[in-house]
Design a protein with these regions (language model features):
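N-terminal auxiliary segments of SAM/dcSAM-dependent transferases
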Residues: 9-37, 50
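Class I SAM-dependent transferase core
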Residues: 29-71
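General small-molecule cofactor/ligand-binding pocket signal
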Residues: 49, 124-126, 224
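Residue-level signal for inorganic ion chemistry
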Residues: 64, 184, 241
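Conserved SAM/SAH cofactor-binding pocket of Class I
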Residues: 67-164
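SAM/dcSAM-binding transferase cores
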Residues: 233-288
Length: 288
């Protein structure tokens, strides 16, 4: 199902990427009053409604958007879009893209559609299982070799080390199956044009899985580790890959969320406030 909107780690303080405005007072998208909130992202440049419980967008989505290479005219697909945080953040940074928000949960997809409209961003919302096959993608308007950029924040918690959540939506959004990463990257490989870019965020301790999944059809990998602080191991990796590239792997200097006093890094504060992008977004930019 597709719908289109028209254009009309740890922080010591409240994160700049989200200001909780409390529950809304009306009823929308199947949620009763008090069941969802409206939050400010990118220093208030985006206002997003999302469920009060279950999976909620946070700084992973903003960092992913800031690491996504896109330029005006690109067709950009956000796989597993949720309420649209990452894809809409890319659209706020890069004007003139064609944005596709792909989400398996109809309720979240409807929130994403409403969020795009409320923020004046043109976006097509597609209800689709990213793990589905080529026929399902084609029926949804995602033909092979049809997209310039894919970004994704797949479920990445290891089920063997993750305590099951009683909330089905949260479990679906956070816990990976044995084939999640491979199937999502395979879907991106099929959908991207030659030379198209894929950006993803993943657990740092799962980097080996990422490299293995990118082993066929992608090259030019660029990796940016994300640490809570300089004394701690990386907690996330941001990865950009290019379909069909033969370029060698590059590892960028790590991003530290906090300094030694547990104060948010100035660069991170700027990114979360919607001011600027990460190196992965400005190198190896997709498009023709």
């Amino acid at each position: 199902m597709r719908t289109t909107t028209s254009r009309p780690a740890r922080f010591s303080t409240t994160p700049a990427w989200r200001t909780n405005c409390g529950p809304m007072t009306d009823r929308a998208n199947g949620l009763s009053a008090g069941e969802f909130t409206e939050d400010g992202f990118l220093g208030g440049q985006l206002r997003l409604r999302q469920p009060k419980s279950g999976h909620r967008a946070g700084h992973d989505a903003v960092l992913l958007a800031a690491a996504t290479p896109a330029r005006p005219g690109d067709r950009v697909a956000d796989f597993g879009a949720g309420v649209g945080a990452a894809g809409l953040a890319v659209a706020r940074r890069v004007a003139g893209i064609t944005l596709l928000l792909v989400e398996i949960a109809p309720q979240l997809a409807e929130l994403a559609r409403g969020n795009a409209s409320a923020n004046g961003i043109a976006a097509e919302t597609i209800v689709l299982d990213v793990s589905g096959g080529a026929d399902a993608f084609a029926a949804a308007g995602l033909a092979p070799d049809s997209v310039d950029v894919v970004l994704m924040n797949p479920p990445f918690n290891d089920p063997a080390r993750h305590r099951a959540s009683p909330q089905a939506a949260r479990e679906l959004a956070h816990v990976a199956s044995a084939t999640t990463l491979e199937s999502w990257i395979g879907a991106a490989r099929r959908t991207l044009k030659s030379g198209g870019a894929l950006s993803l965020i993943w657990r740092a301790d799962g980097l080996a899985e990422v490299l293995a999944a990118f082993g066929r059809g992608f090259g030019g990998l660029a990796i940016l580790p994300v640490h809570g602080d300089a004394a701690s191991p990386a907690i996330r990796v941001l990865v950009r890959a290019t379909k069909g590239s033969k370029a060698p792997l590059q590892i960028y200097p790590a991003l530290m969320l906090n300094d030694e006093r547990a104060v948010p890094n100035k660069k991170v504060q700027d990114i979360l406030a919607g001011n600027g992008a990460l190196p992965l977004a400005v190198s190896g930019t997709a498009g023709s």
